Amino acid sequence: MPGMPNPTQELKGKIPPHNLEAERAVLGAVLLDDSALSTATEQLSASSFYSAAHQRIFQALVELSDLGQRPDILVLSEHLRSCEALDFVGGSAYVASLTDAVPSAANVEYYTRIVCDAAMRRSLLKVARIITAEAFNDTVSGNIVLETAQREIYDLTNARRVATFKLLKNLIPDLVNTIETRYRNQSDLVGIATGLTALDNLTGGFQNSELIVIGARPSMGKTALAMTMASNIAIRQRIPTAFFSLEMSNLLLMQRLIAAESGVSATNLRKGLLQLSDFGRIQNAAGEMYDAPLYIVDVPNMKLLDLRAVARRLCVQEKIQIIFVDYLGLIVADNPFAPRYEQFAAISQSLKSLARELDIPIVALSQVGRPAEGSAPNLADIRGSGAIEQDADVVMFLHRDRNETETQLILAKQRNGPIGTVELEFQASFTRFVCKSP
């Protein structure tokens, strides 16, 4: 439309945000006082600098620090010369001039914030160009463009610095400290405890970046098991937890949760058949639950890209540490017209990627086919079994005779631990699972 401004055209020819004097001040501060490097590296990486010469100088300062050397002007110049980079950065004279840019290292944090802010603005412009290019591409759907935008912004929000390699000797102290802490605590748990002790003993708790799949036939109690775990994690341990309920409304989930926490029959709650004493138990349970960091998302037929977007937002805003998804078969794949097995594969791969991206465990429920009467389910029975078996770090199955309370939780796959069977008791009246008494 004539007269309408074109933001893309307006940006052409503009120099990206930067502040060379602040960059020189950061580098000069480090040369004056090597302890300033710790302050700078908390927010900056080499790519945070606009000048290519400054990028290489900062990287050299980090390299010298890693080697245990104090990076003064002479040492830095010799290091750059040995790397054949001294001429590239402007020679020894330019390196020496960096200390002229700042009287002392006292204000390095201030200069670092300026450089960091300019780097963030350049990154935002880069993301904007990526999104704009995809938005103009008619072969890419709007939903995919939205997913790209959400992913890029999330990555930008959380990418404080670029990934770096570490020498083995630099990793050993952290490992030794972790081992010593575990020894002092005398605990087998290295992940998030589910509250089902026998299961936690087998798994060591649910680990960050893991995809855990719980499979069962219909009406075996998948949701009840997931809610048992989620309530143990969020209510008793106060660990921020997200529960994506694609099958059941949040009101029904809360009704189940109140029954499980109060010990009041779920059937009586649903029908209103309550005794006066029940109200006190319900109020006590509600009080325990009130401040629990349990976030319920009840969107039927939720799209995969929406699930990822909400999960990212919850992790940023609420610091979620574990996600439950009930259940895989109700997630709408990005390509709903693909064959169903391809959709399952895409969903499985996406959830595993999301677990790694967010660095938290994701627990996904799944229905299994009907095995022969009386036989326990196995990996081949789970829908999308090929993809799930490949992507999941842990796969477990609920198994029991339909009208029995004694339940087996079969740990059929554990990438980093043993397999086995956990004996549980299903308390149907309260829609909860507990470990079977020995």
UniProtKB/Swiss-Prot annotation:
SUPFAM superfamilies: N-terminal domain of DnaB helicase, P-loop containing nucleoside triphosphate hydrolases. GO terms for biological process: DNA replication, synthesis of primer. ATP binds at A216, R217, P218, S219, M220, G221, K222, T223. GO terms for cellular component: cytosol; primosome complex. The keyword Aminoacyl-tRNA synthetase does not apply. Homohexamer. The main replicative DNA helicase, it participates in initiation and elongation during chromosome replication. Travels ahead of the DNA replisome, separating dsDNA into templates for DNA synthesis. A processive ATP-dependent 5'-3' DNA helicase it has DNA-dependent ATPase activity. This is Replicative DNA helicase DnaB. It comes from Treponema pallidum (strain Nichols).
